[in-house]
């Protein structure tokens, strides 16, 4: 996997991709990261990459020429086809399903805008898709690029010490449920004890408890993710049992 990032702050991406799981994956050679600053491809003494918008209004707009030259340099550096992704609040929301799709690509170019945005002509001519982190606005696309790099890199084969870790994450699995609660030592603590079933050694019971907790959490915290009509009999039974137990606990 190769990431090429067009950004005015390439050092930011290099630093964020050097930490934790992602940093270790990079050291293993599971992906490469290349930052490209459009200012390096701007002409004139001031290396200008922005100008005022036609029609007036606040802010500045990133210019076509430096971006086009930067993108051409990226394509010249490696013949591998690359999907060009613009990080924008106008894009489709980033989901785990999209992350899995991106993780299967050999290469992508992440375009990070700044100021009021990028000249629309450049976007229409070069961008394959736009992705958003959510319905809010950031100072630039770098944080979005860092999120995509992190999410995609950890899915590369060998990135995680235990491959099952990714399979058990929230939004993974057959229904895309939220993850279940996790506990570690000590078993007993003033803040509460670890559920007895997790200490029982009964793997079937533990699996059923974890599945039930995932169902309950998804129903309570992200009901938009749970299609109860699509649940199988076993899942429906687990969810009904949990709801019944909650009602009994709440009753005087």
UniProtKB/Swiss-Prot annotation:
Source species, domain of life: Bacteria
Catalytic function, reaction form: guanosine(37) in tRNA + S-adenosyl-L-methionine = N(1)-methylguanosine(37) in tRNA + S-adenosyl-L-homocysteine + H(+)
Binding site for S-adenosyl-L-methionine: 113, 133-138
InterPro entries: Alpha/beta_knot_MTases, tRNA_m1G_MeTrfase_C_sf, tRNA_m1G_MeTrfase_TrmD, tRNA_m1G_MTases_N, tRNA_MeTrfase_TRMD/TRM10
Enzyme Commission code(s) on record: 2.1.1.228
Function text: Specifically methylates guanosine-37 in various tRNAs.
Quaternary state and interactors: Homodimer.
Family (UniProt): Belongs to the RNA methyltransferase TrmD family.
Protein's UniProt name: tRNA (guanine-N(1)-)-methyltransferase
Species annotation: Stenotrophomonas maltophilia (strain R551-3)
């Amino acid at each position: 996997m190769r990431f090429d990032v067009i950004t005015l702050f390439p050092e930011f991406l290099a630093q964020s991709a050097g930490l934790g799981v992602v940093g270790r994956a990079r050291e293993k050679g599971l992906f490469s990261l290349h930052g490209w600053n459009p200012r390096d491809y701007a002409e004139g003494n001031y290396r200008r990459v922005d100008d005022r918008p036609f029609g007036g209004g606040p802010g500045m707009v990133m210019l076509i020429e430096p971006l086009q030259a930067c993108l051409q340099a990226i394509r010249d550096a490696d013949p591998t086809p690359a999907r060009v992704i613009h990080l924008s609040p106008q894009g489709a929301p980033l989901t785990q399903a999209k992350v899995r799709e991106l993780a299967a690509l050999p290469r992508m170019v992440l375009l990070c805008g700044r100021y009021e945005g990028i000249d629309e002509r450049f976007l229409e001519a070069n961008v394959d898709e736009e992705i958003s982190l959510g319905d809010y606005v950031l100072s630039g696309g770098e944080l979005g690029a860092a999120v995509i790099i992190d999410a995609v890199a950890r899915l590369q084969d060998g990135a995680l010490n235990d491959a099952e870790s990714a399979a058990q994450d929230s939004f993974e699995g057959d229904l895309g449920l939220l993850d279940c609660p996790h506990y570690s030592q000590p078993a007993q603590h003033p803040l509460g004890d670890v559920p007895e079933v997790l200490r029982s050694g009964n793997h079937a019971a533990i699996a059923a408890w974890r599945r039930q907790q995932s169902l309950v959490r998804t129903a309570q915290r992200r009901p938009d993710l749970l299609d109860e009509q699509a649940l199988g009999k076993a899942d429906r039974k687990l969810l009904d049992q949990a709801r019944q137990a909650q009602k009994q606990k709440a009753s005087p």
